[in-house]
């Protein structure tokens, strides 16, 4: 049986067992990603898109090939629909600023009442400057978007809807294609915060008719500081640049500069070349695994959910049995602080997340303080889940 952990130095080099269940926050890096970054700095370092010498030409070619890999992974039609950014937050802010500087000014954006801060604050800040309005669509008790309420809001006139593909708190999965159809029926556009969706397997954004999609490389086993904003080509062409600098302008004129076509229009300055190469290596790695990433994570999430249900008094936030769930479970144990559980689990070599998960609106929606979240990555297996649940049960016995 293939041992995925052997591909990751963080697990190979531990003297004591280390169970990492916080991949919703960030994923560890396989050796091939680390090698791609260090090889670039050690043997092929040069800038991209700016010089004619061979080292620059070679690395520029490698850099652009990663756009093709990303496009294939997410199901984009064109490489030019892939804009490199610093991460999901950067992508959403880029889109919010550019849209509010053009066709969104004075209009209306809809987000859900349970979004990550990145998909609320980016819109609220940009819309406040342009005079646009942000409205919130309700979610049900499992965290699933209330489509009838969304339609009611759309009938009032909306330019853009921005929703999470997978909630980082509840794990609720957005029915993307169904939502896209509804949003487009009323003449609006759909943007997706894909931070928790991109790592669960290849996507089909063009088939789902998604207009914009944002994600971070570090949640796809790639380095930090690199992300992607996908946008349909014609929509990216409709947006103005939000940063000025090298390589995003064709002809400078103090009155009427002519800017590059997307994606370069949105990539001012020297990019995070090492991060891009690491992102390409991460996608290569995932595609070469001898099993389906999606099937593995779906089955393991189901196993985690069912094992957690065996713990007395436990409350699992979000979708219940039979409803699609992203690869995470947030839990509450009445009378026990999530931060205490996280601290005690760390003492047993188990890393989980405790807190509000950078989503205070979601905490308010379910009237929660903090939750304990276990989230899965490609390197996790059933034994990790068993060890986590047994450690949790052992800790809880001391409270009773």
UniProtKB/Swiss-Prot annotation:
Keywords: Pyridoxal phosphate, Transferase. Its EC number is 2.8.1.7. Its cofactor is pyridoxal 5'-phosphate. The modification N6-(pyridoxal phosphate)lysine is found at residue 219. The keyword rRNA-binding does not apply. The keyword Transferase applies. It comes from the Bacteria. One of its GO terms (molecular function) is cysteine desulfurase activity. GO terms for biological process: cysteine metabolic process. The active site is at residue 358. It catalyses: (sulfur carrier)-H + L-cysteine = (sulfur carrier)-SH + L-alanine. Catalyzes the removal of elemental sulfur and selenium atoms from L-cysteine, L-cystine, L-selenocysteine, and L-selenocystine to produce L-alanine. Belongs to the class-V pyridoxal-phosphate-dependent aminotransferase family. Csd subfamily. PANTHER family: CYSTEINE DESULFURASE, CYSTEINE DESULFURASE 1, CHLOROPLASTIC. This is Probable cysteine desulfurase.
